[in-house]
Amino acid sequence: MKIFNSLTKQKEIFKPIESGKVKLYVCGMTVYDYMHIGHGRSWIIFDMVVRYLRMRGYEVTFVRNITDIDDKIIKRAGENKESPAALAERFIQILHEDEKALRVLSPDQEPRATQYVPEIIKLIQKLLDNQYAYTGQNGDVFFDVRRFKDYGKLSHRHLDELQAGARVEVSDSKRDPLDFVLWKKAKPGEPKWDSPWGEGRPGWHIECSAMSSSILGQPFDIHGGGLDLKFPHHENEIAQSEAGEEKPFVKLWMHAGLLEINKEKMSKSLGNIISIREALKESDVEVLRYFLLSGHYRNPLSYSKENLENGRLALERFYLALRGLPVVNHEKTSSYTDRFYEAMDDDFNTPIAFALLFEMVREINRFRDNNQIEKAAVLAAELKCLGNIFGLLQYSPEQFLQGAKKEADVQEIKKLIDQRNEARAKKDWKTADQIRDQLTDLGVAIEDSSDGTSWRQE
């Protein structure tokens, strides 16, 4: 098996530190808001990685953290007039609901930053002892970036090129703008813990270093996360962990490509962030999972209605091939499974793996056409087994195809309403009335108001 290592910028033959066992840490969420589809892509990608490694016989220890204390949590809690702990707990429950809705496997361990404050303090003390950290004039403790000679080795940028990242605060207390905070001195009304440097709370980056190494040891096999975390977060994790423990931190780094919305960057400033909950109102979970895994995990992917519809049609092909076949136990594999493994062993090449699954669909249909139902059923069982690695083909064909028809009907209704609104805007009343009649024939009642057009199926 070969996996692309962001650290070396090349595919490497994957050999776990301990034979047959894989220790994997993935950065989780800061719990102050709903999970969006960008988070969803990263979660589903690493869910696929865990499922595949386990299918290949590895004993995987999968750790994904929760950041439950952070500036953003404190700010949002203040706006909501609730405690940071209450806000975090509420969104942790929401996160778990979304995780279940996405069919993402729960991690083996899900550490929270607030549970690891003693380990965080211990690591900061080591950094101070090793002279990689200092206390600023304001009482915060900072990491001395220029003291760590390998800084920039993950993002492949020289220190002179680097600018303070979006989540690295500029402060007069720093010796250098690139230095980042390890421990923040307590402010009135904020959560705080005792430390050798006074009351305060951990910085964001140090949390992941302490949690991952405390649970998995150092070094461990794979550290994953979204590409947006590569710098400064993951770069800072390496610096802290290797300066503190004086040994390598992680063997292999994996980064999931970013998700775009209609080929535009997803951002709050553009107002185009889509939550998982919104996405699952529009599309079935299998359609969403298929779409999010359809491109190579390292490449950017554009979320659009057209791409989701393509995903729905692709899944229809799978389920139409399975419909009406007897269910048999999957006991033996064919060359298709070998070729599937070959694709996935090449840096989790899901586009080639999906192409192979469609080959299987064509073969199933040929068997069916030739009335070789037993052969079709055996291959269908193999197809379902491979689909499970992607969290797909979990419905009965009847369930999915009926749901897909309803979804298609809703999309058609929305399309007709948009066309009618355009006609009304142009004062083309004849066309608007014709479309209203079409909708009535579909059993749809519409109501126009100053807020727009609402509809319901009767």
Swiss-Prot record:
Listed Pfam families: CysS_C, DALR_2, tRNA-synt_1e
GO cellular component terms, semicolon-separated: cytosol
Subcellular location: Cytoplasm
Essential cofactor(s): Zn(2+)
Placement of sequence motif 'KMSKS' region: 265-269
EC number(s) on file: 6.1.1.16
Cofactor: how bound: Binds 1 zinc ion per subunit.
UniProt superkingdom: Bacteria
Binding site for Zn(2+): 27, 208, 233, 237
GO MF term list: ATP binding; cysteine-tRNA ligase activity; zinc ion binding
SUPFAM superfamilies noted in UniProt: Anticodon-binding domain of a subclass of class I aminoacyl-tRNA synthetases, Nucleotidylyl transferase
Family matches, as InterPro entries: Cys-tRNA-ligase, Cys-tRNA-synt_Ia_DALR, Cys-tRNA/MSH_ligase, CysS_C, Rossmann-like_a/b/a_fold, tRNA-synt_1_cat_dom, tRNAsynth_Ia_anticodon-bd
Reaction catalysed by this enzyme: tRNA(Cys) + L-cysteine + ATP = L-cysteinyl-tRNA(Cys) + AMP + diphosphate
Family: Belongs to the class-I aminoacyl-tRNA synthetase family.
Cited PANTHER family: CYSTEINE--TRNA LIGASE, CYTOPLASMIC, CYSTEINYL-TRNA SYNTHETASE
NCBIfam families in the record: cysS
Name of the featured protein: Cysteine--tRNA ligase
Lineage: Bacteria, Pseudomonadati, Pseudomonadota, Gammaproteobacteria, Legionellales
